[in-house]
C-alpha cells in the first residue's frame, strides 16, 4: 500500500517537471535571436580610453617648477628697471659732487681768491712790507673778477715780477668793481698806494 502511494507521488512530480520544461521551451521559442548578434555579445570588450602619448600629465612637481620659473622671469624682468633707476640716482649724485668739486677747484685755482659760503668770491693779497699781512681787496660776483683784482694789486706792488693769474693781461684792464660793502674801493687803493711807496713799479692802467 505504501509503495503504491510513493510511486504515484513520483509520477506526479515527474509530470509537473515535464510541464515546466515544456512551458519554458515554448517561451524561449517565441524569441527569434540572430546567431551573429548572440555571438557578438560575447565578443564585446570593455571600452578603456587610451591615453595619447602627447597628452600632458598633471605632475605637481612640474607645476611648482613652472610657477617658480615664471616668477623668476618676472622678477628678472623688473630688476633692470630698479638697477637703471639706482644707477641714474648714483650718476646724478656723482655729477653733483663733481660740479661742487670743480667749483671749489676753480675757486682755489686763482691766486689770492677765496670763495665765501654764500657764493661770492673774496680777493686779498699779502703785503711783503708788512710781514705778509693780508690786504683785503673786496668781494666779487665771480672768481674771475676776484682774480683780476688780485692781479691788479700784485702788479702795483711787485711790478712785472709779480706772479699773476692772467699774465698776458697785465696792465690792460682796471680792477673790477667791488660788490662788497665792508670796505670802499678808495680805501683799498689808498692802502695799496702806501704799500708801494718804497717800490718803483708801473701803474695798472687796466685791471
From Swiss-Prot:
PROSITE patterns in alphabetical order: AP2_ERF
Keywords recorded for this protein, A-Z: Activator, DNA-binding, Ethylene signaling pathway, Nucleus, Transcription, Transcription regulation
Positions with biased composition (Low complexity): 74-87, 197-207
Primary location group: nucleus
Subcellular location: Nucleus
GO biological process, one term: ethylene-activated signaling pathway
Domain of life: Eukaryota
Record has Protein transport as a keyword: no
Family from the record: Belongs to the AP2/ERF transcription factor family. ERF subfamily.
Record-given protein name: Ethylene-responsive transcription factor ERF106
Lineage, top ranks: Eukaryota, Viridiplantae, Streptophyta, Embryophyta, Tracheophyta
Annotated gene: ERF106
Amino acid at each position: 500500500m505504501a509503495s503504491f502511494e510513493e510511486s504515484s507521488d513520483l509520477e506526479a512530480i515527474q509530470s509537473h517537471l515535464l510541464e515546466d520544461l515544456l512551458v519554458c521551451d515554448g517561451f524561449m521559442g517565441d524569441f527569434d535571436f540572430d546567431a551573429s548578434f548572440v555571438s557578438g555579445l560575447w565578443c564585446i570588450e570593455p571600452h578603456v580610453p587610451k591615453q595619447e602619448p602627447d597628452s600632458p600629465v598633471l605632475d605637481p612637481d612640474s607645476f611648482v617648477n613652472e610657477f617658480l620659473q615664471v616668477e623668476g622671469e618676472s622678477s628678472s624682468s623688473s630688476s633692470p628697471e630698479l638697477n637703471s633707476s639706482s644707477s641714474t640716482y648714483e650718476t646724478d649724485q656723482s655729477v653733483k659732487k663733481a660740479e661742487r668739486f670743480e667749483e671749489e677747484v676753480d675757486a682755489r685755482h686763482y691766486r689770492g681768491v677765496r670763495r665765501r659760503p654764500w657764493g661770492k668770491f673774496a680777493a686779498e693779497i699779502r703785503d711783503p712790507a708788512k710781514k705778509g699781512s693780508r690786504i683785503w681787496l673786496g668781494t666779487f660776483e665771480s672768481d674771475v673778477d676776484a682774480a683780476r683784482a688780485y692781479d691788479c694789486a700784485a702788479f702795483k706792488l711787485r711790478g712785472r715780477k709779480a706772479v699773476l693769474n692772467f699774465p698776458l693781461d697785465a696792465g690792460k684792464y682796471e680792477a673790477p668793481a667791488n660788490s662788497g660793502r665792508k670796505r670802499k674801493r678808495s680805501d683799498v687803493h689808498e692802502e695799496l698806494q702806501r704799500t708801494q711807496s718804497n717800490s718803483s713799479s708801473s701803474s695798472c692802467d687796466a685791471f
